[in-house]
Amino acid sequence: MLQIAMKTGKIKLFSIVGILLTSVLLSACSVPFLSKPQGPVTLEYWGLWESPNTIDTIINDYKKINPNVNISYKKRTPQQYRESLENQIAQGSGPDIFTFHNTWVPMLKEELDPMPASVMSKTDYKNSFYPIAMQDLTIENEIVGFPQGYDGLGLFYNEDIFKAAGITKPPVSWTEFTQDAAKLTVKDESGNIRTAGAALGAASNVDNFSDILGLMILQNGGNPKNPKDKQSADALDYFTSFTKGQNRVWDETMPASTLAFSGGSVAMYFGPSWRAIDIKNANPLLKFKVAPLPQLAGAKVTWATYWANGISANSTHKKEAWDFAKYMATDEVLIKLYAESVKSPGRFFGNPYPKVNLASKLASDPIIGAFVQDAPFAGSAPMASRTLDNGLNDQIIKAYEDATNEVLAQSNATGALETASASIAQILAEFGAK
């Protein structure tokens, strides 16, 4: 009996030792001093608009708290950027982190990595950014990017022309806008426009015409992706009315609208915030401000067009890439990025902040403030100008350009948009968009 007890004791002892050894071996993977040291991680980041000097300042700060992560920023050219991005990621190369437009999500659904819940909860994301971010930057209810700024349309107005006409404030409704545009227009004896009340009504020489028309369709309750409805036709009729007949306030003999506004020959002009930089550089003495967009009666609706940072679905360092993308969207970094951007030659301000809690920092700015005030009410559609995507936006814009020209040539808006709708349906199907 004693021998059996001793053997049993040995077996128990060996079992305990075995369990302990196994535990040590299994835990070696998680204990730093027992695991194999990992080398530094290198991430490639593609951007479009910010200079390497600006981004490198942010990268250097990040590296101080993440010394094992190296980030190489490459500023790409906008032309054929979207196609190059898709092709390289499809081939297993390309960047880990990349900039993309808010309307590109349907085209990049294979390339964008869904954000893990551990990075940020959907509730925190929704509470942090303007509502349009959650609307635009998701695929099947999964978040795929962090907005790096916010932009849209603002109503630029020439202070001197307003003062000369006795108008003391910018219009807040489209009714006021129409009345002011007529009052601000100056023509010569032959009926030629010398000072345009508003740069509006044509596709050929109205920069950002598609954004303006898209805004009007959304405000009127139409569907920019399927503009067969009466609301869309009414919006197109209203848009083109500014160039028609004896009461026109703009026409196709005028220079391109940004150039005309910069030259002081237009009272009101619509554009994104970055156009203010072009205008100030072209004419530093021009006195102008930017107001929130005119509205119809009812719910307020504005327009968004902005850029975000996403992570490649093929990245081998997704954890580190998402961590940096989140870092780029923190309050401190956005504020510093804004300040660093202003240091670039010809820049007077940075990107408007995409976060709700930072709105008060820019709300009183005579240029940026209007965009921040409009941001909570923004909608969007794939007809945003200047994305240079050769895809959804550029092709849908062409369909709307043709429809606008047809109406200016005396065609019916409903008929013109029926043709456009057929083209838009094909374009959406080609890129797998809804």
Residue ranges of each PLM-predicted region?
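Short, well-ordered beta-strand elements
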Residues: 39-50, 69-74, 96-97, 198, ...
